[in-house]
């Protein structure tokens, strides 16, 4: 009898649970259909009640038993308007919500941040306004609300989120002090807000870039806070015996203040007059010195139409003007005198010097790189230049055409490439926004760059290295074919050269620590270049109000916890179809390249082979080997 009752109860419970599960997934479906009807979207969603939600709906992930919807991912889907709060109350099993890079506006519904199982919220690059809801789920791991219009204080409840590892609130209008934040936090960015007060001790270990753009913040790692000084209480200088005495005291105080002001003005005027006289004296002395030393600077001639050209010839001495050394195979027919007469335009300033576009009188256009802080002597410099200049030709390597060396001036001459460089193509420049670069073009550019670097590594008995791999040094022809430039310069430079933060973003940890470059550190830099291509984020500090980005660390923090696809450039997601596997494969190659341990990184030859396997010659999207699971990426030893 007991067995029959137990069997009956088991059947009853099983039926009840199955019905509950069915109701749950059905209610999730209805909630999502409600979401689609309430939130306008320019990209069509294939959400239809007639097709299975877990298998076919765009941006939807379900639990393993298909019982509940656990992830909603609609980045760059053209969503606009406010989010419906009641809809998310019904989706209480969500662990991940990614609505980044849309046009959503209004307040962030408080129910979303307090969902019981929510772990990752990616709401950056929208138009959300209002304050950050104070009630937050204790399970939150990743919270990105950056690049919105949020205001008010940062909630103090954040300090109670013991699992939070990544917090991005930059580029908003948040104000007030920074609260204490949880100790497990590994990535923090609060830059470009209106925060004030002292940086709390719980986050002082983060770099200054995490707090930049908040002019009222102080304390480590920013400038020290001023000491708190309290003004002494005013006390009367004479006893107050009645109204008459008080009036005399006030009158005396005014008289003393007026005298002090007069003395201050007199002293200030004297100091100002002294400074003006000193400046006039220095200017006169410089003018006299310039007249005596005018022979050291090449005299401008009528054909020289731009004063910028003098910058890369200012250290050239008259006796050495014809010592421009050309390499075999160069078709140029000019000497240093012709080069110094050329009009010039600054193309950019990098780690090792300034680059100019020089147009000679006969119309020839070349690129001249003026090196700074060269530590090598003449013999060592010439030997290195000979090794660089005599490397066997390769279609993806920009050849060094000529060089010049003197005590005060070191110049390198290259071909001019009309297509610009990969950085300009990927991120745009000051004159305009970036183009929507498709996956095919990105993949081909990076593969050609890899072939060029691999050739540099294999030439001259594998003794050469690049030493300065970054997207601005990946030059492009008009047909967008790649030539890798600026290789072989690193061994000549001073170890004390100040490397800009935008270049540090490409440097391997061991290269930053020792200031010595190897072929393995080149592989790391190329891995960062691949991550830059995949994410659309510039490595290191960029112009404008962009934050300092440690790409390997950022990518690893995302794929460690959640969905690998969250790292990809929204432009790729908008444009491309059937290339997700190739993108994941490329991400795996990039993460192998940026391994913390140099010996764990592949060689550039191996990198080329792996990239060629993704897209064999003549095959289309999706035809490469099937991508491995995201867990493989998360388990790599790349920096966290």
Curated annotation (Swiss-Prot):
One of its GO terms (cellular component) is plant-type cell wall. Residues 226-247 have a biased composition (Low complexity). PROSITE patterns: PROTEIN_KINASE_ATP, PROTEIN_KINASE_DOM. It comes from the Eukaryota. ATP binds at residues 347-355, 369. Residues 1-22 form the signal peptide. The chain crosses the membrane at residues 260-280. It is a single-pass membrane protein. Residues 341-614 form the Protein kinase domain. The keyword Transmembrane helix applies. Coiled coil: none annotated. The modification Phosphothreonine is found at residues 364, 441, 514, 564. GO terms for molecular function: ATP binding; protein kinase activity. Its main location: membrane. It holds the Pfam family LRR_1. The modification Phosphoserine is found at residue 343. Keywords: ATP-binding, Leucine-rich repeat, Membrane, Nucleotide-binding, Phosphoprotein, Repeat, Signal, Transmembrane, Transmembrane helix. InterPro entries: At_inactive_RLKs, Kinase-like_dom_sf, Leu-rich_rpt, LRR_dom_sf, LRR_N_plant-typ, Prot_kinase_dom, Protein_kinase_ATP_BS, Ser-Thr/Tyr_kinase_cat_dom. Residues 222-249, 289-315, 612-640 are annotated as: Disordered. LRR repeats lie at residues 93-115, 117-138, 139-162, 163-185, 186-206. It is found in: Membrane. PANTHER family: OS05G0588300 PROTEIN (PTHR48010), PROTEIN KINASE DOMAIN-CONTAINING PROTEIN (PTHR48010:SF64). The protein kinase domain is predicted to be catalytically inactive. Belongs to the protein kinase superfamily. Tyr protein kinase family. This is Probable inactive receptor kinase At3g08680. It comes from Arabidopsis thaliana. The lineage of its organism: Eukaryota, Viridiplantae, Streptophyta, Embryophyta, Tracheophyta.
């Amino acid at each position: 009898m007991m067995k029959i009752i137990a069997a009956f109860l088991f059947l009853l419970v099983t039926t009840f649970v199955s019905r509950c599960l069915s109701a749950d997934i059905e209610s999730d479906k209805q909630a999502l259909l409600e979401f689609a009807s309430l939130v306008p979207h320019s990209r069509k969603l294939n959400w239809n009640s007639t097709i299975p939600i877990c298998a076919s709906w765009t941006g939807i992930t379900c639990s393993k038993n298909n019982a509940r919807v656990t992830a909603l991912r609609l980045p760059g889907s053209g969503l606009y308007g406010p989010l419906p709060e009641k809809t998310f109350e019904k989706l209480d099993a969500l662990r991940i919500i990614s609505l980044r890079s849309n046009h959503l506006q209004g307040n962030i519904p408080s129910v979303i941040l307090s969902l019981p199982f929510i772990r990752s919220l990616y709401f950056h690059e929208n138009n959300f306004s209002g304050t950050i809801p104070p009630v937050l789920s204790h399970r939150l791991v990743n919270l990105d609300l950056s690049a919105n219009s949020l205001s008010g204080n940062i909630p103090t409840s954040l300090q109670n989120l013991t699992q939070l590892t990544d917090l991005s609130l930059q580029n908003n209008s948040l104000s007030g002090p920074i609260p204490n934040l949880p100790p497990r936090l590994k990535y923090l960015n609060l830059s470009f807000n209106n925060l004030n007060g002292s940086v709390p001790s719980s986050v002082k270990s983060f770099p200054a870039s995490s707090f930049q753009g908040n002019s009222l913040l102080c304390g480590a790692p920013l400038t020290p806070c001023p000491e708190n000084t309290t003004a002494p209480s005013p006390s009367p200088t004479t006893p107050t015996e009645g109204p008459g005495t008080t009036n005399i005291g006030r009158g005396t105080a005014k008289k003393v203040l007026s005298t002090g002001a007069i003395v201050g003005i007199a002293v200030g005027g004297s100091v100002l007059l002294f400074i003006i006289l000193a400046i006039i004296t220095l200017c006169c002395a410089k003018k006299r010195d310039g007249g005596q030393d005018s022979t050291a600077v090449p005299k401008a001639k009528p054909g020289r139409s731009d004063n910028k050209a003098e910058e890369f010839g200012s250290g050239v001495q008259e006796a050495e003007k014809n010592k421009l050394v050309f390499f075999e195979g160069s078709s140029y027919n000019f000497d240093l005198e012709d080069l110094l007469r050329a009009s010039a335009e600054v193309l950019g300033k990098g780690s090792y010097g300034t680059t100019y576009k020089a147009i000679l009188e006969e119309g020839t256009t070349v690129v001249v790189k003026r090196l700074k802080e060269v530590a090598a002597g003449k013999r060592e410099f010439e030997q290195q230049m000979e090794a660089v200049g005599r490397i066997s030709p390769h279609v993806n390597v920009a050849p060094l055409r000529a060089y010049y060396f003197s005590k005060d001036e070191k110049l390198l001459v290259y071909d001019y490439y009309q297509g610009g460089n990969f950085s300009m193509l990927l991120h745009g420049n000051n004159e305009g926004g970036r183009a929507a670069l498709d996956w095919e073009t990105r993949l081909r550019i990076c593969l050609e760059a890899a072939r060029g670097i691999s050739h540099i590594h294999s030439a001259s008995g594998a003794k050469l290295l690049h030493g300065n791999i970054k997207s601005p040094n990946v030059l492009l022809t008009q047909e967008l074919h790649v030539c890798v430039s600026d290789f072989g310069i690193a061994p000549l430079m001073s170890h004390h050269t100040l490397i800009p933060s935008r270049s540090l973003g490409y440097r391997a940890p061991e290269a930053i620590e020792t200031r010595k470059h190897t072929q393995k550190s080149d592989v790391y830099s190329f891995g960062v270049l691949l991550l830059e291509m995949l994410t659309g984020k510039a490595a290191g500090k960029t112009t404008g109000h962009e934050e300092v980005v440690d790409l390997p660390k950022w990518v690893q923090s995302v794929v460690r916890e959640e969905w690998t696809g969250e790292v990809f450039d929204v432009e790729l997601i908008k444009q491309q179809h059937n290339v997700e596997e190739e993108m994941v494969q490329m991400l795996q190659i990039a993460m192998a390249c940026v391994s913390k341990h140099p010996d764990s990184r592949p060689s550039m030859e191996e990198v080329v082979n792996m990239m060629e396997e993704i897209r064999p010659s003549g095959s289309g999207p999706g035809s490469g080997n099937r991508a491995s699971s995201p867990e493989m990426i998360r388990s790599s030893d790349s920096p966290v």
